C-alpha cells in the first residue's frame, strides 16, 4: 500500500473525527472523507458490504437509508464493529449491526420513513478491509412512498449536498450499468458541487445485468462519457445470491473471474473490481487528506487559541487528574488575589476600555466626590455669620466687649470641624461599596464553583466590614485630634492682623476669571424639543461663565452663560431615559437661555452628575435647596448689627475661613492615606496571605469545589476538547513531509453531464468500438461501428482525445479508412474481441494483416482485411 506514513493519515482522521464527534464538533471541521451517492437500488449497499466482507446494512423496498452512515473501516487482526453512541459494546454478529442501525435510525427519525441529517458513526475492524472512511447517504428518490413527505426528494438532495459540498470530501458516484448514465442524478449532484471533477470518482455497478450483446467498455475506459478520475466497474451479488446466503468472499472471487473472462473487460481487469476500488479510494483519500492537512491544522490552531482563553486556569491539568480540585482551588484563589490587586492598583495588560475599574472609581471618590462633599459645607455664609455674632454676644454677656474674643473663634472652629465627620464617613462608605463591587467582579471567574464563590465573597466582605469599623474609628480620631487643639501658630494661618485687613475687602476673593475648571460633553434636554429632541454639546466651565460649543475643537461657540445668580437643582430622571439630569436656573427669575427659565443638562451616569456639581461648586454655583435654607435663616436675622460687632464678625469669619481651610487641606490629604492603609492595603494582604486558610477552615475542600451538573459537564467537555485539539495538532505535526502524492488526472470534457439532451438514452451501451480519422471531429460524419484495426497501447493521449458522441444500437458497418496510423490512441492494450474458438492465452498483439476477430454479437463475421 505504499508509504506507511501515508497509510497512517486515514486512522488519524478517524481519531480526530471521533474526538470531535464526542463533543458535538464533528460538523464544524471538514474532515476528509468519501461520500457515497447514488439512486435507490443503485448498488450502494452492496459496494459497501463488499468493502467490509459482511452483510450488515439494512435492505428493503423504498427508502431504507434515512440517516447518513459514517463508516470507518480499520484494518485489524480481529473482526468486530463499534457504534459511537454505544462504545462499550462490541458487535461480532453483523446481523445485530443491521438491527442496531435500524433501531438507531428509528430512534431519531421515527417509523414514518422520514429522514435526518444526524449521522450514525460506525467503526468496523476487520482483517479484510483497507483503511477507509465513507459516508453512506440516502438514495435519491423522486416519488414519495407511503407516509413519506411530499418534498422527500428535496430533503434528500439537501442532505446529500450538505455532505458533498465540503471541499474536503471525495464523492463516490454510484450508477448501475443498466441505467442511462447521462441522466445519472449522482453525477449531476457531483457536477453541481465539483465542476472541475477533482473530487468525483465514478463507480459502475451491475455490469453483469446489461443486455446481451452490449457492454460498458467505452465508459470504463473513460472515453465515451469521461470523468476526470474515471470509472471503476464492480459486480455485486444479485438479490438471488443474497437470499441464497452467497458468501461475499465467494462473490469477490466470482467478480474477479467475470472481469478476467469477459472479452470486453479482460484487458482492464487489473483496474476493475472491488479490490481495485478499495485501493483507489484509499489512495485518493490519502492524497486528499495530505492536501487538506494545512487547512485542517490552521482550523485546529484557531479553535485552540479561542479555547485557551476559556480554559486559561485549567489548561495545565486534565479532568481525570486526582489532584485537580486542589490545584484548581489554589490557582483560583491566587488568580482572585491577582485580579483584585490589578483592579485596585491598575495594570497595563488587559485594560478595560468600557468602564472604570475599582481603583479608578476609588480615585474619583478621593479626589472628586470627597472634595465635593467638603465644598458643600463651606458656602453656608449667612448661617456662619449669625453663629459668629451669637458666639461673640454670648461670650461678652452683660458686658460690652472692646476686643474680638478668641473664644468665639475657637467655638466656631470646633463646630465647623465636627461637621467634617459626615463627609468623611460618607467617603468611607463609598470606598467600601466599591471594594465589595470589585470583589464580586473578581469572583465571577469562580462561577463554576458556586460554593467557593459564595464563601470567598462572604469571607472577604466580612473582613472589609471589620476594617470599616477600624477605619471609621481612626478617621473620627483624626477629627477629634483636630478639634482638641486649635493651632493659631500654623504657618498658613492668617492671624488677627491679616484678618482685620482682609475684613475691609468683604471676602471678594474669587478664582482667576479665565481659569478653566472643567470641560466635557453634556446633553441639553430641553433646548431642541421642537427640533427633534435633545442635542449634545461640548461644555467649558470657567470661574465666570459656562460656554458650549459644537465640538471639542471649541471653534464654533453656541452660547456663553455668565455664572452670576445661577443655582443648581436636581431633576428627576425621565421614565424612558437612561440619562441622569440636573438643571441650572437664575435666582432672579430671569430666562437663562432665550425663552427658557432653566437649562436641563444630562449625563450618562450619576457619577458624572456629581462630578459636574462639584465643578460648579468650585465656580461658586451652589445647589438650590441649601440656598433656600440660607434664605430662611436670613429672614430670622433681619436685625441690624452695630459697626463694631460687624467688624468683629468679619474678623472671626476670616479667621475661621483660614483655619477651616487648613483643616480641610489636612483632612483631604489624610483621608485617602488612612483608607488605603487601614482598609485597601490590609484587604489585599488578607486575600494574598490569609484567605486560603479561612477557606479551608470554613469548609472542607470537597464541598468548596462542588460544581453544578451543568457547569461540571461544560467544564469537562471544554477541557476534553482542549486536550483533543492539542493531541490532534501534535499528531499532525509528526507527519512525514516526504510523503509523495499521486498526481491528479488531467481535465476532461465533462459537459455531457449538464447537456444530456444531445446524447442517446443508452450512451454506455457499446456494441462495437469505432475509430475516427485524424483531424476530423466526431460530428463531421456519422459513427461507423466495427472492430478496431489495430489495438493501441494505453497512453496519456487517451485523456486528451475529444469525447466520442453517443450512438444508437448496434448495426453493421465498415471503416472508410483502414490506415492503422490514422486512428487516435485507444485505451485497450489488447484486441477488444476474441473469437469463441481462441483460448484466453492468445497473444494480445497481431500484425496489421492478421484477420480481425468477430464481435460477440456476430461471432462468425469475417474480417474486412481478409
Curated annotation (Swiss-Prot):
Residues that bear Phosphothreonine: 751
Region annotation (Disordered) ranges: 737-866
Matches recorded under Gene3D superfamilies: Dynamin, middle domain (1.20.120.1240), P-loop containing nucleotide triphosphate hydrolases (3.40.50.300), Pleckstrin-homology domain (PH domain)/Phosphotyrosine-binding domain (PTB) (2.30.29.30)
Superkingdom to which the source organism belongs: Eukaryota
Subcellular locations according to the entry: Cytoplasm, Cytoskeleton; Cytoplasmic vesicle, Clathrin-coated vesicle; Cell projection, Uropodium; Endosome
Protein role: Catalyzes the hydrolysis of GTP and utilizes this energy to mediate vesicle scission at plasma membrane during endocytosis and filament remodeling at many actin structures during organization of the actin cytoskeleton. Plays an important role in vesicular trafficking processes, namely clathrin-mediated endocytosis (CME), exocytic and clathrin-coated vesicle from the trans-Golgi network, and PDGF stimulated macropinocytosis.
PROSITE patterns (UniProt xref): G_DYNAMIN_1, G_DYNAMIN_2, GED, PH_DOMAIN
Protein name: Dynamin-2
Chief subcellular location: cytoplasm
GO BP terms: actin filament bundle organization; autophagy; centrosome cycle; membrane tubulation; neuron projection morphogenesis; phagocytosis; protein polymerization; receptor internalization
Annotated region (G5 motif), positions in chain: 235-238
UniProt-annotated stretches for the region G4 motif: 205-208
Signal peptide start and end residues: none
Pfam families given in the database record: Dynamin_M, Dynamin_N, GED, PH
Family: Belongs to the TRAFAC class dynamin-like GTPase superfamily. Dynamin/Fzo/YdjA family.
